[in-house]
Each structure stands twice: as C-alpha cells, then as structure tokens.
Amino acid sequence: MQPNDITFFQRFQNDILAGRKTITIRDASESHFKAGDALRVGRFEDDGYFCTIEVTGTSTVTLDTLNEKHAQQENMSLDELKRVIAEIYPNQTQFYVIDFKCL
C-alpha cells in the first residue's frame, strides 16, 4: 500500500472532497511541496487514504497576515482560522500556504 504524502484532520475531509477547502496552512516541516505535485491525502487520525490533490501554488504567511481570503479558502471564519492555526502550531508565526485542487 502506498503511503500518504499529506494528512488532514478527519473533520476537513468532506470540505476537501466538496471543493470548499482549497488551501492548507502548514509549518516549515511541510514547506517542500511545489506547484504541480500530486499528493496522496490521508486522514490524520487513521492515515486512511481519501483522495489525491494537485498543488496549484504555494506562498508564505504569518499569523498576523492571515486574511478573509485565506479564511474563505479554508471554509471558516478568520477568527476560527487563527484559533485553529494557533492550536495546531503553538508558538509559531511563519507558515506556508499550499493551494490545491482535488484530482
């Protein structure tokens, strides 16, 4: 069985499959992805594969420069996005935005 290239919390699976979530914000450990990469996607909780995505772009962002567009692409409010990022990556300020589409 092929390993997954990237994982998402299960709560995001339906939004990804429906095209409502089109970016992910990660820390430096996942900053190596580039436009054109096809990635196998699994659930964080059980590593179960659920789709393949294509990276369509990448950029950098800080917690302070997150904006409404990022929130819309994540399918959540800006306040919720900032809270989620701060919970997942405590004490970090520099992040990497990965734009993607389902294949």
Swiss-Prot record:
User: Is Hydrolase there in the keyword field?
Assistant: yes
Q: Which domain of life is it from?
A: Bacteria
Any single GO CC term annotated in Swiss-Prot or TrEMBL for this entry: cytosol
Reaction catalysed? N(4)-acetylcytidine + H2O = cytidine + acetate + H(+); N(4)-acetyl-2'-deoxycytidine + H2O = 2'-deoxycytidine + acetate + H(+); N(4)-acetylcytosine + H2O = cytosine + acetate + H(+)
Domain ASCH, residue spans: 6-94
Q: Which UniProt keywords apply?
A: Hydrolase
Pfam families reported in the protein's UniProt record: ASCH
Q: What Enzyme Commission number does this protein have? A: 3.5.1.135
- Single GO MF descriptor: N4-acetylcytidine amidohydrolase activity
Record function comment: Catalyzes the hydrolysis of N(4)-acetylcytidine (ac4C).
Q: Family, per the entry?
A: Belongs to the N(4)-acetylcytidine amidohydrolase family.
Q: What is this protein called?
A: N(4)-acetylcytidine amidohydrolase
From what organism does this protein derive? Answer: Salmonella typhi
